[in-house]
Amino acid sequence: MKYKNIFSAALLAMAAFVGFNSCDTDTEAEVIQDLYKYDSQYFENLRAWKQSPHEVTYVYYAAWAPLEGQAGYKDPASWGERIIGLPDSLDIVNLWMGIPTPATHPVAYQDMVYCQKEKGTRFVFHGDASHFNHTFYDRVWDEATQSFKYVTDAKGDTVVIKTDPEKEYTLRSYARWACDTVMKCGLDGVDFDYEGWDNNSMAIVANECDKFFGPNGPWPEKLFIIDWFGGAPDGCDDYCDYFVRQAYTWQIGFQTGTGGRPQEKTIYCDSFGGEAGEAGPRGAQICDYARWEPATGHKGGCGAYYVDTNYKDPSGIPYGEFRKAIQIMNPAVHK
């Protein structure tokens, strides 16, 4: 009797196990949400707004590119690693890790071009104003063709230039190289990383770039930006569209100094990087910078370093805190 009961119990347990397993094999429809599709009027309004006077948003963005030292290009499934996944209302993107081109980074390049044409987002490359001895081909402006042309020596070889703070011509040639790079790569401007140059060298480069990107140059719509930490360069105010106060690391305290630069041209940044700990994904102090205004006038805008960290915002909304900062500075108009 005892064995019979054990056997019966075993049969019941087996039946239950089979029953549970049969339930697991039933297919359940998985709901996949499609991306929201906007009409042409939405994008037209977005582009028009970005061309209007307003406090801008700015990011340093590197997630589009492979890690430093790795070859090839990325074709990521996550929109957190796609340029096209950045917020529509974002104004300016500083391209960390290089410049995407059709040959080197086709996915990122297509995303960039789409964002430029449809969303009116502007992309600048990262120019170095921290070191000297850069080497590049010398070039000059050709009025006849309205383009740059390489300088050649008596043998017909292209002249190579190296930046030297004691030689003004090398700095002006470096500025022409930067402007030519912007035009050849289809970018919207250059952002010089000012972390070691002297004021005079930066002013020379700014003055030369202004010949091409300034109001009287052939491409006045292009941006000339300087980002700085510790001290902002003198002598560039008339040439510069924006001065970006850097934040490679999370800032302790609330930094609102301009370094003596015009308030309305100053963009205040914070870091969403790993050193910010839990504050990084939450957006650090970006909303505080969005809310803050000087006693008179207005700021140029606010921005973020390592904005890709905020893609996984605790709210579940990609770039949730950064989007909130955009709305604080420039509330959407609902009609």
Stretches with model-predicted labels:
Residues 1-22, 142-165, 335:
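Polar low-complexity intrinsically disordered regions
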Residues 1-52:
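Bacterial Sec-dependent N-terminal signal peptides
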Residues 324-335:
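C-terminal domain-boundary segment and adjacent tail
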